[in-house]
Amino acid sequence: MIRFTLALAVIGVTFAASTPQIETNPNLEIIGGHDANIIDYPWQISFQHRLHHFCGGFLISDTWVVTAAHCIYEGYSDTENLNIRVGSSEWSAKGKLHDVKRYITHPQYNITTMDNDIALLELALPVDLNQSVRPAKLPVAGQEIPDNAQLTITGWGATYVGGYNEYTLQVVTIPTVNINVCQSAITNDTITNNMFCAGLIGVGGKDSCSGDSGGPAVIDGQVVGIVSWGYSCADPKYPGIYTKVSAFRDWINEETEI
Protein backbone atom coordinates (compact mmCIF):
# COMPACT_ATOMS: atom_id res chain seq x y z
CA MET A 1 0.00 0.00 0.00
CA ILE A 2 1.33 3.41 -0.92
CA ARG A 3 1.28 5.89 1.91
CA PHE A 4 1.80 9.60 1.69
CA THR A 5 0.93 12.23 4.22
CA LEU A 6 -0.76 15.59 4.22
CA ALA A 7 -0.27 16.58 7.83
CA LEU A 8 -2.58 19.11 9.39
CA ALA A 9 -1.80 20.74 12.69
CA VAL A 10 -4.66 19.13 14.55
CA ILE A 11 -6.49 16.69 12.22
CA GLY A 12 -5.84 13.97 9.66
CA VAL A 13 -7.96 13.23 6.61
CA THR A 14 -8.23 9.88 4.85
CA PHE A 15 -9.44 9.20 1.33
CA ALA A 16 -9.18 6.27 -1.04
CA ALA A 17 -8.32 6.04 -4.71
CA SER A 18 -8.26 3.02 -6.97
CA THR A 19 -5.71 0.29 -6.20
CA PRO A 20 -3.20 0.92 -4.72
CA GLN A 21 -5.00 2.78 -1.95
CA ILE A 22 -3.54 6.16 -1.14
CA GLU A 23 -3.99 7.12 2.45
CA THR A 24 -3.23 10.19 4.49
CA ASN A 25 -1.92 9.39 7.94
CA PRO A 26 -1.08 11.79 10.80
CA ASN A 27 1.26 9.25 12.40
CA LEU A 28 4.05 9.41 9.83
CA GLU A 29 6.83 11.88 10.31
CA ILE A 30 10.34 13.15 9.69
CA ILE A 31 12.49 10.99 11.95
CA GLY A 32 16.09 11.32 13.06
CA GLY A 33 16.46 15.00 12.23
CA HIS A 34 17.24 18.10 14.27
CA ASP A 35 16.25 21.76 14.49
CA ALA A 36 17.12 23.89 11.47
CA ASN A 37 17.44 27.63 10.88
CA ILE A 38 15.46 29.09 7.97
CA ILE A 39 18.51 31.20 7.08
CA ASP A 40 20.20 27.98 5.98
CA TYR A 41 17.16 26.92 3.91
CA PRO A 42 15.59 30.24 2.84
CA TRP A 43 13.63 28.68 -0.04
CA GLN A 44 11.56 26.55 2.38
CA ILE A 45 7.91 27.54 2.83
CA SER A 46 5.03 26.24 4.91
CA PHE A 47 1.97 25.54 2.73
CA GLN A 48 -1.11 26.20 4.85
CA HIS A 49 -4.88 25.76 4.73
CA ARG A 50 -6.79 28.09 7.05
CA LEU A 51 -3.49 28.87 8.79
CA HIS A 52 -2.69 25.22 9.52
CA HIS A 53 0.46 23.70 8.04
CA PHE A 54 -0.22 20.66 5.87
CA CYS A 55 2.59 20.52 3.30
CA GLY A 56 5.95 21.97 2.43
CA GLY A 57 7.18 23.68 -0.69
CA PHE A 58 9.97 25.90 -1.97
CA LEU A 59 10.33 29.27 -3.63
CA ILE A 60 11.65 29.44 -7.18
CA SER A 61 11.10 33.21 -7.54
CA ASP A 62 9.47 36.01 -5.60
CA THR A 63 6.03 34.97 -6.91
CA TRP A 64 6.25 31.21 -7.57
CA VAL A 65 6.41 28.15 -5.32
CA VAL A 66 6.87 24.47 -6.17
CA THR A 67 5.08 21.79 -4.14
CA ALA A 68 3.67 18.28 -4.67
CA ALA A 69 0.51 17.80 -6.73
CA HIS A 70 -0.89 15.49 -4.06
CA CYS A 71 -0.89 18.43 -1.65
CA ILE A 72 -3.72 19.95 -3.68
CA TYR A 73 -6.83 17.83 -3.62
CA GLU A 74 -10.57 18.12 -3.06
CA GLY A 75 -11.16 19.97 0.19
CA TYR A 76 -7.76 21.67 0.13
CA SER A 77 -7.87 23.34 -3.27
CA ASP A 78 -9.88 26.45 -2.36
CA THR A 79 -7.43 29.27 -3.02
CA GLU A 80 -9.21 31.71 -0.71
CA ASN A 81 -8.10 29.52 2.21
CA LEU A 82 -4.59 28.73 0.96
CA ASN A 83 -1.49 30.65 1.97
CA ILE A 84 2.20 30.16 2.56
CA ARG A 85 4.52 31.35 5.31
CA VAL A 86 8.01 32.43 4.31
CA GLY A 87 11.07 33.53 6.24
CA SER A 88 10.47 31.67 9.49
CA SER A 89 11.81 28.54 11.18
CA GLU A 90 8.37 28.22 12.77
CA TRP A 91 5.37 27.35 10.62
CA SER A 92 2.93 29.16 12.94
CA ALA A 93 4.72 32.44 13.67
CA LYS A 94 7.18 35.07 12.45
CA GLY A 95 8.16 35.57 8.84
CA LYS A 96 5.28 36.61 6.62
CA LEU A 97 2.09 35.04 5.29
CA HIS A 98 1.27 35.30 1.58
CA ASP A 99 -1.98 34.43 -0.16
CA VAL A 100 -2.02 31.92 -3.01
CA LYS A 101 -3.46 33.47 -6.18
CA ARG A 102 -3.74 30.21 -8.15
CA TYR A 103 -2.23 26.77 -8.47
CA ILE A 104 -1.23 24.62 -11.43
CA THR A 105 -1.01 20.87 -10.99
CA HIS A 106 0.90 18.92 -13.60
CA PRO A 107 -1.60 17.87 -16.31
CA GLN A 108 -0.32 14.27 -16.22
CA TYR A 109 -0.31 13.85 -12.44
CA ASN A 110 -1.62 10.38 -11.60
CA ILE A 111 -3.04 9.95 -8.10
CA THR A 112 -2.83 6.15 -8.40
CA THR A 113 0.80 5.82 -9.49
CA MET A 114 1.97 9.15 -8.03
CA ASP A 115 3.74 9.91 -11.30
CA ASN A 116 4.27 13.61 -12.17
CA ASP A 117 3.69 14.61 -8.53
CA ILE A 118 4.42 18.31 -8.91
CA ALA A 119 2.43 21.55 -8.71
CA LEU A 120 3.06 25.28 -8.87
CA LEU A 121 1.64 28.00 -6.66
CA GLU A 122 1.46 31.58 -7.89
CA LEU A 123 1.39 34.12 -5.08
CA ALA A 124 -0.97 37.09 -4.99
CA LEU A 125 1.92 39.43 -4.14
CA PRO A 126 5.69 38.99 -4.41
CA VAL A 127 7.69 38.05 -1.33
CA ASP A 128 10.37 40.38 -0.02
CA LEU A 129 13.71 38.69 -0.64
CA ASN A 130 16.24 38.71 2.21
CA GLN A 131 18.60 36.33 4.01
CA SER A 132 15.62 34.26 5.22
CA VAL A 133 13.63 34.36 1.97
CA ARG A 134 15.44 33.31 -1.18
CA PRO A 135 14.55 31.29 -4.30
CA ALA A 136 16.03 27.82 -4.65
CA LYS A 137 18.66 26.87 -7.18
CA LEU A 138 17.22 24.30 -9.59
CA PRO A 139 18.93 21.60 -11.66
CA VAL A 140 19.04 21.77 -15.43
CA ALA A 141 16.60 19.74 -17.50
CA GLY A 142 17.54 16.07 -17.63
CA GLN A 143 20.09 16.24 -14.83
CA GLU A 144 20.41 12.81 -13.21
CA ILE A 145 20.56 12.01 -9.51
CA PRO A 146 23.77 10.19 -8.50
CA ASP A 147 23.61 7.08 -6.33
CA ASN A 148 24.69 7.44 -2.69
CA ALA A 149 24.57 11.24 -2.80
CA GLN A 150 23.78 13.06 0.43
CA LEU A 151 20.19 14.32 0.19
CA THR A 152 19.06 16.96 2.68
CA ILE A 153 15.35 17.25 3.46
CA THR A 154 13.63 19.94 5.53
CA GLY A 155 10.13 20.19 6.92
CA TRP A 156 7.80 20.54 9.90
CA GLY A 157 6.67 16.91 10.26
CA ALA A 158 6.31 15.35 13.71
CA THR A 159 9.46 14.00 15.35
CA TYR A 160 7.93 10.85 16.81
CA VAL A 161 5.29 8.36 15.74
CA GLY A 162 1.84 9.62 16.64
CA GLY A 163 3.02 13.18 17.19
CA TYR A 164 1.75 16.45 15.77
CA ASN A 165 3.66 18.70 13.41
CA GLU A 166 6.89 20.05 14.82
CA TYR A 167 6.72 23.83 15.27
CA THR A 168 10.41 24.30 14.51
CA LEU A 169 11.83 23.43 11.09
CA GLN A 170 13.61 20.07 11.05
CA VAL A 171 16.41 18.82 8.79
CA VAL A 172 17.64 15.32 8.03
CA THR A 173 20.22 13.96 5.57
CA ILE A 174 19.97 10.53 3.93
CA PRO A 175 21.67 8.87 0.94
CA THR A 176 20.07 8.46 -2.45
CA VAL A 177 19.37 4.87 -3.49
CA ASN A 178 20.11 3.19 -6.82
CA ILE A 179 16.92 2.98 -8.88
CA ASN A 180 17.17 -0.80 -9.35
CA VAL A 181 17.74 -1.38 -5.64
CA CYS A 182 14.78 0.87 -4.92
CA GLN A 183 12.51 -0.92 -7.37
CA SER A 184 13.42 -4.28 -5.84
CA ALA A 185 12.19 -2.93 -2.49
CA ILE A 186 9.10 -1.20 -3.87
CA THR A 187 7.70 -4.35 -5.44
CA ASN A 188 4.06 -3.43 -5.96
CA ASP A 189 4.51 -0.07 -7.68
CA THR A 190 6.66 1.43 -10.43
CA ILE A 191 9.49 3.88 -9.85
CA THR A 192 9.25 5.96 -13.02
CA ASN A 193 11.90 8.11 -14.68
CA ASN A 194 10.24 11.09 -12.99
CA MET A 195 11.14 9.77 -9.53
CA PHE A 196 14.18 8.88 -7.44
CA CYS A 197 14.66 7.19 -4.09
CA ALA A 198 16.51 7.90 -0.85
CA GLY A 199 16.82 6.26 2.54
CA LEU A 200 18.92 4.11 4.83
CA ILE A 201 18.08 0.64 3.51
CA GLY A 202 18.84 -2.00 6.11
CA VAL A 203 19.22 0.66 8.80
CA GLY A 204 16.24 3.02 8.80
CA GLY A 205 15.74 5.62 11.49
CA LYS A 206 15.89 8.70 9.25
CA ASP A 207 13.29 9.79 6.72
CA SER A 208 10.79 12.40 5.57
CA CYS A 209 7.05 11.96 5.77
CA SER A 210 4.08 13.78 7.26
CA GLY A 211 4.04 17.51 6.98
CA ASP A 212 7.10 17.25 4.72
CA SER A 213 5.17 16.36 1.53
CA GLY A 214 5.88 18.86 -1.22
CA GLY A 215 9.03 20.06 0.49
CA PRO A 216 12.54 20.39 -0.94
CA ALA A 217 15.20 17.69 -1.21
CA VAL A 218 18.64 19.18 -1.76
CA ILE A 219 21.98 17.95 -3.11
CA ASP A 220 24.96 20.32 -3.20
CA GLY A 221 22.80 23.41 -2.84
CA GLN A 222 20.31 22.50 -5.59
CA VAL A 223 16.72 21.47 -4.94
CA VAL A 224 16.69 18.26 -6.97
CA GLY A 225 13.62 16.60 -5.46
CA ILE A 226 10.16 17.02 -3.96
CA VAL A 227 9.00 14.87 -1.03
CA SER A 228 6.38 12.62 -2.64
CA TRP A 229 5.46 9.14 -1.34
CA GLY A 230 6.56 5.87 0.22
CA TYR A 231 5.40 2.62 1.80
CA SER A 232 6.38 3.70 5.29
CA CYS A 233 8.61 6.16 7.10
CA ALA A 234 12.14 5.46 8.35
CA ASP A 235 11.55 1.76 7.71
CA PRO A 236 14.80 -0.08 6.92
CA LYS A 237 13.02 -2.10 4.21
CA TYR A 238 11.68 0.81 2.17
CA PRO A 239 13.29 3.98 0.80
CA GLY A 240 11.24 7.13 0.32
CA ILE A 241 10.25 8.31 -3.16
CA TYR A 242 10.86 11.82 -4.48
CA THR A 243 9.73 13.70 -7.58
CA LYS A 244 12.74 14.43 -9.79
CA VAL A 245 12.75 18.20 -10.40
CA SER A 246 15.01 17.99 -13.47
CA ALA A 247 12.34 15.92 -15.26
CA PHE A 248 9.98 18.92 -15.02
CA ARG A 249 12.40 21.77 -15.65
CA ASP A 250 10.93 22.51 -19.08
CA TRP A 251 7.35 22.42 -17.74
CA ILE A 252 8.28 24.80 -14.92
CA ASN A 253 9.78 27.17 -17.47
CA GLU A 254 6.73 26.97 -19.74
CA GLU A 255 4.39 27.89 -16.89
CA THR A 256 6.52 30.45 -15.05
CA GLU A 257 9.27 31.56 -17.48
CA ILE A 258 11.79 30.63 -14.77
Curated annotation (Swiss-Prot):
Secreted recorded as keyword: yes
Positions glycosylated per UniProt: N110, N130, N188
Active site: H70, D117, S213
PANTHER family from the UniProt entry: AT26814P-RELATED (PTHR24276:SF91), POLYSERASE-RELATED (PTHR24276)
Record's signal peptide: 1-16
Site, Required for specificity: residue positions: D207
Catalytic reactions on record: Preferential cleavage: Arg-|-Xaa, Lys-|-Xaa
Tissue expression remark: Expressed in larval carcasses and gut, and adult gut.
Location within or outside the cell: Secreted
Annotated disulfide bonds: C55-C71, C182-C197, C209-C233
Family recorded in the similarity comment: Belongs to the peptidase S1 family.
Matching PROSITE patterns: TRYPSIN_DOM, TRYPSIN_HIS
InterPro entries: Peptidase_S1, Peptidase_S1_PA, Peptidase_S1_PA_chymotrypsin, Peptidase_S1A, Trypsin_dom, TRYPSIN_HIS
Keyword terms of this UniProt record: Digestion, Disulfide bond, Glycoprotein, Hydrolase, Protease, Secreted, Serine protease, Signal, Zymogen
Domain Peptidase S1: 30-257
Protein's recorded name: Trypsin
